[in-house]
Curated annotation (Swiss-Prot):
This is Small ribosomal subunit protein uS7c. GO terms for cellular component: chloroplast; small ribosomal subunit. InterPro entries: Ribosomal_uS7 (IPR000235), Ribosomal_uS7_bac/org-type (IPR005717), Ribosomal_uS7_CS (IPR020606), Ribosomal_uS7_dom (IPR023798), Ribosomal_uS7_dom_sf (IPR036823). It comes from Gracilaria tenuistipitata var. liui. NCBIfam families: rpsG_bact. PANTHER family: RIBOSOMAL PROTEIN S7 (PTHR11205). Part of the 30S ribosomal subunit.
Length: 156
C-alpha cells in the first residue's frame, strides 16, 4: 500500500450556462482530446433538443435520467482461497452518478443517428422514461448482484 498522502478530491466546477455540476460532469464524459468547447457545444445542443422534444426543463430531465440510471449495487471481483468470487457491493452516491453518466455517454456513442447531440438527447430522454440501453445495463448490474448474493459476506 502506498505510504504517500491520499490525493485530494477535486471540486467539480459548475458549468458556465446552467450553473450545474451534473452538466459539467457530463461534459467531462463527452470530452475527447481536450476539446472542451466542442464537448460543451454538444451537451448544450442536446439539452436544447430535450427542451424542444419534451417541453419540460432539460436539467430536470437530465437529473431524472441520471437518477433512473444510477445503480444501487454492483459486483466486484474478490479472490479468496484460489477462486474468484463476484461479491455484491453497495454503490456510493458519487460512483453511482459517474457510472450513470458513463453508461449514458457510452450508449449514446453506439446509437445510430445524425449528430452526437441528437443521440445524447435521445439517450437521456430514454433514461428518464426508464427505457433504453442505459436502464438495461443498470438492471443487468442489479441482476448480477442478486445472483451473487450468496457471496455478500465476503464484503471488504
Amino acid at each position: 500500500m502506498s505510504r504517500r498522502n491520499k490525493s485530494k478530491k477535486r471540486l467539480i466546477q459548475k458549468d458556465p450556462v446552467h450553473e450545474s455540476k451534473l452538466v459539467s460532469m457530463l461534459t467531462a464524459r463527452i470530452l475527447k482530446s481536450g476539446k472542451k468547447g466542442l464537448a460543451y457545444k454538444i451537451v448544450y445542443e442536446a439539452l436544447d433538443i430535450i427542451n424542444k422534444k419534451t417541453s419540460h426543463d432539460s436539467l430536470e430531465i437530465l437529473e431524472k435520467a441520471i437518477r433512473n440510471a444510477t445503480p444501487l449495487v454492483e459486483v466486484k471481483s474478490r479472490r479468496i482461497g484460489g477462486s474468484t468470487y463476484q461479491v455484491p457491493m453497495e454503490v456510493r452516491a458519487y460512483r453511482g452518478t459517474n457510472l450513470a453518466l458513463r453508461w449514458i455517454t457510452m450508449f449514446a456513442h453506439t446509437r445510430s443517428g445524425r449528430s452526437m447531440a441528437f443521440r445524447l438527447a435521445n439517450e437521456i430522454i430514454d433514461a428518464s422514461n426508464e427505457s433504453g440501453n442505459t436502464i438495461r445495463k443498470r438492471e443487468e448490474t442489479h441482476r448480477m448482484a442478486e445472483a451473487n448474493k450468496a457471496f455478500a459476506h465476503y464484503r471488504y
